[in-house]
Amino acid sequence: MARRYLFEFEKPLVELEQQIEQIRELARDSEVDVSQQLLQLETLAARRREEIFQALTPAEKIQVARHPHRPSTLDFIQMFCDDWVELHGDRRGSDDQALVGGVGRIGKRSVLLIGHQKGRDTKENVARNFGMATPGGYRKALRLMDHADRFRLPILTFIDTPGAYAGLLAEEQGQGEAIAVNLREMFRLRVPVIATVIGEGGSGGALGIGVADRLLMFEHSVYTVASPEACASILWRDAAKAPEAAAALKITGPDLLNLGVVDEVLPEPAGGNNWAPLQAGEVLREAIERHLDELLGLKVNQLREARYRKFRAMGRVLDPSSSETGLPA
């Protein structure tokens, strides 16, 4: 049995999985009928896995969001997009591999798709810069969004980054300016924009393609202003305090839904999207098509106004004695 990537909180399942594999080998090598015993163990393992993943802490959800086999932007595109054509370059001499984009069809509907792309192993992660886009990546994304706006193509973005690349060269090339321009221009787009946090949604790197009419996120994805490790280092001068920081930052789907930051939290199979990627793809496609049907019925001025109001409603400062919730109506 090939060893799979295990989280510490999944260790209680190891013994059960070993028993299941032993029974499968026994069934292959003998005439003994073990189907009933195998079914019982598989049912027990599935139930325990579901119990474990329903009780994950914010710090544990971060681990799931960073799983190396979690479906990536290109994985989702291959699952539900027809006639995908990747488009390259920012027309300023750069073609960032940490942020990919192109045109394709979902059913009969043509769309533009943009997303962060991590690697599966060290070599690929180095090539993709661990999903941390450079200024060239955000300028490429803006070029493609301008293209979509011109040809009236709905825009779908997939967020999965620990943050924008913060190296010296990125700063020299105007990382902050590139992200800021994207924020400004995305508010002006005349087409529907749907963003989905498929893994990590970290800081300005996520916001650079995250100004959307609908913001979705998967159940075990995270969306945060800073990584818990960075937050703990800043506040407590101790990265070991990351679990406490993760809880305080309100980075999980239910918290963000309650705060009015995200519009829908998409369910994941027990074990996370890496456990059943095709099922995750079906869930995401259904949600995208449903929200597109709603947004395409709006006029351009209605779309822009709703997008503006959505973001203006975030981050209100309230008087402690006020009975207001600060949530959008």
Swiss-Prot record:
Q: What EC number(s) does this enzyme carry?
A: 2.1.3.15
Main location per UniProt? cytoplasm
Pfam families, sorted? ACCA
Xref: SUPFAM superfamilies: ClpP/crotonase (SSF52096)
Record's keyword terms, sorted = ATP-binding, Cytoplasm, Fatty acid biosynthesis, Fatty acid metabolism, Lipid biosynthesis, Lipid metabolism, Nucleotide-binding, Transferase
From the UniProt record, give the pathway where this protein acts.
Answer: Lipid metabolism; malonyl-CoA biosynthesis; malonyl-CoA from acetyl-CoA: step 1/1
Q: Which InterPro entries match?
A: Acetyl_CoA_COase_a_su, ClpP/crotonase-like_dom_sf, COA_CT_C
Q: Which reaction does it catalyse?
A: N(6)-carboxybiotinyl-L-lysyl-[protein] + acetyl-CoA = N(6)-biotinyl-L-lysyl-[protein] + malonyl-CoA
Q: Where in the cell is it found?
A: Cytoplasm
Which protein family is it in? Belongs to the AccA family.
Please name the NCBIfam families in this protein's record.
accA, AccA_sub, PRK05724.1
Q: How does it assemble?
A: Acetyl-CoA carboxylase is a heterohexamer composed of biotin carboxyl carrier protein (AccB), biotin carboxylase (AccC) and two subunits each of ACCase subunit alpha (AccA) and ACCase subunit beta (AccD).
* The name this protein goes by in its record: Acetyl-coenzyme A carboxylase carboxyl transferase subunit alpha
